[in-house]
Amino acid sequence: FIKYGFTKQEVSKAFSSLKLPQGFSNSEGLIFPAQYSFPQGISAQSAAQSMIDRFSDDPNGRKLLQGNKDFSAKQLLTIASIVQAESTNEDFSKVARVIYNRLRIGMPLQMDSTVHFIMQARGDIFLSRKSTTLNSPYNTYRKFGLPPGPICSPSSDAIKATLEPIQGDWLYFITVAPGDTRFTASFDEFSSWKVEYTKNRKAGAFK
């Protein structure tokens, strides 16, 4: 997008003058993930605006922008972004439920993806104990509640899972090995799985 046709300055200016949905002050999380094709000669601002508009064109995106009785549109987008960053499609709905369950009881979210966002290390598996102490409003290990905004642009599936999470009492989840993500309401069970995860990671299972 930037490399083929627009300068960095043009893109920066375009994103600073977008027409955003109500309740949003910047475009973070609103750039709908999709393949885009723009006609030759289109302005950077028009191209950027079409990417924002695509969000509300999506049925799930449009529903999210309406908010609900418990969360604003921005809060829902923030939740959806964490769901996207934390899991794969098959687990989106369960991860969303974990987030809601933790918020409901006032439990810190402690989502690794929010710390990876601070560190610009998305996709990492390992999170050091030291990194969980970083002083940032996005650090859900230190800060209760949701971070101040989205940490990525969620897919339509992640948005749908956020709006319609599966029922369950889970409070914890962990990927013990590639393709093996487990959910539980028991801290003791989670702790035993964490030991299993550590053994697998040290054995190179995540390489």
Features from the language model and the residues they span:
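Membrane-embedded segments
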Residues: 1-2
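Bacterial extracytoplasmic/cell-wall-associated proteins, especially those involved in peptidoglycan
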Residues: 7, 13, 17-207
